[in-house]
Amino acid sequence: MKNIISSPVEVPLLLPKHNTNPATRPQTSQTTRILLLLLIAISSSLIWLRPTKPYPSTSNSSAFKHPHERNPSYLVSGKNGVVASEEARCSTIGIDVLKDSGTATDAAIATALCVGVVNSFSSGIGGGGFMVIKPPTGCSTKPCSSRTPISINFRETVPDGDYYQAEFYKDPSKSRTGGLSIGIPGELAGFQAAYQRFGGGVSWQRIFQPSIDLAKNFSVGPALAVVLSDPRIHPWMKTKTEWQSVFQPNHRIAQLGDWIQRPNYARTLQIIADHGIHPFYHGSIAQQLVDTINRHGGRVSLADFQTYQPIIEQAINTTYHNYNIWTTGPPSSGAILLHAMNILERYSLHDHPRTPLAEHRFVESLKYAFSARTELGDPKFMNSSELARMDLIESKPYGLKTSLKIDDDRTYDYSHYKPKYSIVEDHGTTHLSVVDRFGSAVSLTSTVNLYFGSNVMDPINGVILNDENDDFSIKGRSNAFDLYSSPLNYPITGKRPVSSMAPIIVDYLHPQPSNGSLVEPEFFCALGASGGSRIFSAIIGTLLKLLWGYDLSHAIEDPRLHHQLLPNEVYVETSYRSDFLDSLKSKGHNITMIDIFYGKAAIHGIHKRLSEDTLFGSSDSRKHGVPDAY
């Protein structure tokens, strides 16, 4: 049974279920409207009366909401399963799959497909990403006989050809829009690989059906409405027939609550539900995509689709005291996240109250982590010395050595941290987390990169294609700090670009008893984020707050700070604690205040208190997320 924990003055304004029809929706009475307005007014007044000190540890189900003016996040709880995503309808679709005996992997795929329908600006089967899967308890079959988490890298790849570097150097805009910006999509291949290993509680068709139905007719949700209101997308969206037919249902760009249809995309999902991914990589859909990409200036062949393969391997990990953190390897930023946690381990931050000094150390760890990120690349294209360097960066001794360089009294200019190359800033993405009653967990991040990817939609199958080639470095280009682009991230046939994505699953390692019996690690949390280069700073900050005793909703909603070394600025969200801010300024940090909705990272996660059975889920209000549980 799902419990929604909220303060008594807050009224959940949930979107309708995915099968709601506008003709049958109940009408709100005038009396109800008045009551809602009164409750909102009372809530607004109480917000200003709430303290802004750190949230205390919550030991029961009565939790405060974060005192922000935006809609608060929901904290849901259940003992059988939780799905946390950026869209209420998609979280519910995932829970419905779990209720039908689906696994966490089944539910994660169903949820991700749904997000690709209703929030197609950030993800979809025309994109790719990374996931970490923790196998279920008691599984004896080969893929999960060990409970060691695995990672699936379904990042997009560069099509065959040696002209991308020269084309992007001559005209960098070609890496952002049009056919040359498109990498070979990996999402469906990644989903099939996950389903074959850890899915099957429900059929492949059952996983796809809710999104097929949804694509035929759905209302514009808050996240999509925000993106569609951005005037930067209007010029091209209003001039392309295939986009007009979907996003201009009333001869204007759709707005919140408008009903839109994606019938071509629904048919494509139906084909994949009936026949698997073969049509997408080897058949008619693949040929349609090849033709569309090339018509928009690309140079791909059917062979580029036919040869695409996801990469399945053991997840990489580090320990932070008694917590085992599992994530995805390069070219994701999982290794960089682990490096930051290794830097911070010496301070045992979780054993002490949150202080201004702890915030300074956190910022410094980010600056060193982003310096290390400039040496990231696709391992398949790295030589032995480059691979050894990446192994060193992930290691405990290197993290400790780096932590000893942190000065508790001051910060430094970027050159002190010795970045080797310039930093490529990526964008977009969606994240979701799922835990089921079998003890399996999935942390999945997917993207089409910039809003609506390459701005190319196939007119026949409705697939919106990524612009992932924009995440590569351009040879010969230097940035404003005279740092040149990284040769480790140049576009080469088959290569996957560097990404900020870093989904994590964290277990607690119980002390082993003296009698020699083994105590299995206990699930602690699954976290991940959307938001480009702000992703892993948001994940680390949220994880630290969970370790400080915050409940999940508070850990996610608390104002954040972010530093990516270049530019040498600490980006601080409004409502951040003023005493912490003053301390950072006193140590020489350059502060830039940002609106909570500008350049945001959105965290969607699941948490379990140690030695308890209840799972808690929360989705970030920065992207209007709503979780579900039962």
Residue ranges and their predicted role:
Residues 1-28:
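Short, low-complexity, Lys/Arg-enriched N-terminal segments of secretory-pathway carbohydrate enzymes
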Residues 30-54:
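Terminal signal-anchor or tail-anchor transmembrane helices
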Residues 48-51, 55-96, 104-275, 280-282, ...:
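Noncatalytic scaffold domains of N-terminal-nucleophile
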Residues 61, 251, 349-448, 461, ...:
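Internal maturation/activation junctions in enzymes
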Residues 97-98, 189-197, 275-282, 287, ...:
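Alpha-helical support elements that line or immediately flank enzyme active sites
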Residues 117-140, 148-151, 299-301, 440-517, ...:
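Active-site rim segments in enzyme catalytic domains, especially the processed small/beta chain
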Residues 312, 426-429, 451, 499-501:
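Short, small/polar residue-rich loop motifs at catalytic or cofactor-binding pockets
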Residues 495, 539-540, 548-598:
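Extended C-terminal subregions enriched in glycine
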